[in-house]
Amino acid sequence: MSTYNIVVVGAGVTGLTTALLLSKTPANKVTVIAKHMPGDYDIEYASPWAGASYMPFGKKGSDHAEWERATWPALRDLAEHQPESGIHFQDITIHNRLKDQNTATGQWSAELTSANPWFKDFVLNFQNLPRDQLPPGIDNAQRFTSVCINTAIYLPWLVSQCMKNGCVFKRAVLKHISEAAETHHSGKKANVVVNCTGLASRTLGGVADDQVYPVRGQIMIVRNDPGSMTSISGSDDGGDEVSYIFPRAAGGGTVIGGTYQKNNWDPLPDPNFANRIMQRALKLDPRLVKEGQGVEGLDIVRHGVGLRPARTDGPRIEKDQVDGVKVVHNYGHGGFGYQVSFSCAEKAVGLVNEIIQQQHDRAKL
């Protein structure tokens, strides 16, 4: 049987999911190379800092929306049948303020906070809250059952699933994407390289995509558990500040955030932002602390900053050839990498298969 050597560059949620789907075909021999691996916490490595939850942002009818629709069944299946993945069901309440519609956070969440969103027919238990149940200043709100992902469990779980299928993991730092073709664990040149380097695609040789930019998110993880997830379209603290609360599975703590700061590379948690994040979280869901405690009642595990790998024209999922190396790109997913991970990986795998089929056909001539 013919075998095909594939190198996936990047070990965030996009790279790991792509490697997992590729490795399900026995003929594919997959090597994953990355500067950062699950267990690392680094400003360049966005996936560990994610909330992470399923909250669709894509505009109705867009590729983004279809990717989110197509990924939901996989996340739902993991929550139902493989709780060891660190994914569990959580109710979420989304609050919308019309005055946020022209802010960075309001535009980011416009579809999510719509009173009639496209995803209402397939997420679980969707309902619009009656107007008499809305908090002051809220124009509409919705509630549904989503999933929350404990990234500290899920990313290593993806690694373990890849390894069960024979994937080999190697740390490496590349200056040029074409170098990846020489890093396959077989010692032979790769048939295809899959570029899942996220924000690094901005500077990686042979890619150097100037459409890629960071969107800074500052969060904190606390031990407090309010019992369900909550989010809102914006805040009065600034157009790029927002509030969300995500209790993670398996003792992962509760993520509270956050910020949506485009082109901000600052890797250090800002104490002023941290204070505002805590104040907003308590206002959004007072159940976080006992009555009368205030922010002093928040038991902080850690502060963190992640740079969402956004791209001006949206994710790049396409075939390429760089210095004679066949490349498939899958990067630029911004703050929605988890909730499009499976569908975008499936598209990337389809492109890899096209390249392999072409190589196979030429070899027969």
What are these regions (language model features)?
Residues 1-5, 23-28, 37, 355-365:
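Eukaryotic N-terminal targeting leaders
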Residues 2-4, 36-66:
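Conserved N-terminal glycine-rich FAD pyrophosphate-binding loop of Rossmann-like flavoproteins
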Residues 7, 14-25, 32, 48, ...:
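Active-site substrate-recognition segment that forms the wall
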Residues 60-74, 141-157, 268-273, 340-341:
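Short beta-strand to alpha-helix junction loop
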Residues 73-166:
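Flavin (FAD/FMN) cofactor-binding and adjacent substrate-gating region
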Residues 130-132, 157, 291-365:
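C-terminal catalytic lobe of FAD-dependent flavoproteins
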Residues 138-192, 196, 201-203, 351:
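Helical element adjacent to the flavin cofactor pocket in flavoenzyme catalytic cores
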